[in-house]
Amino acid sequence: MKKLFAALMFSVLPLTAMAAAPAIPLEKVDIDLTDKAAMQDGLKTFTNYCMGCHGAKFQRYERVANDLGIPEEVMMENIVFTDAKIGDHMRIGMQPADAKVWFGAAPPDLTLVARVRGTDWLYNYL
């Protein structure tokens, strides 16, 4: 029985290593964090096209505005489309239960994706 278990483990372990490898090589991305105009454009794109489903619940509007050099009034008029305050987290209105019915699963929060999967993965995903 021990030999059967050992044989099974040695045949299954290599499969798990192959499953963890990326299916395709990721294209490298070079992000210039000092290019405020590009970062502001990315924020606009995210809030207009992604934030309807994907939240950024670990990020605050105020922090984004400060980091990107956006005045509070401009941020509230052009980026925040809800009744949220400048110090609120960037949440979405869609309930997870509704998302599960509509899409089969709740869309993931995107706050920490770059930290967890890396910027190359995120660039290739988008």
Predicted region positions:
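Post-cleavage N-terminal segment of exported redox proteins
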Residues: 1-33
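Electrostatic cytochrome c docking/interface patches
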Residues: 20-44, 55-66, 75
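Generic structural "secondary-structure junction" signal
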Residues: 26-28, 92, 112-115
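Solvent-exposed, acidic/flexible segments
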Residues: 32-39, 43, 100-103, 115, ...
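C-type cytochrome heme c attachment motif
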Residues: 44-56, 96, 106-117, 121-124
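Mid-chain, structured segments of secreted extracytoplasmic proteins
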Residues: 62-100, 104-107
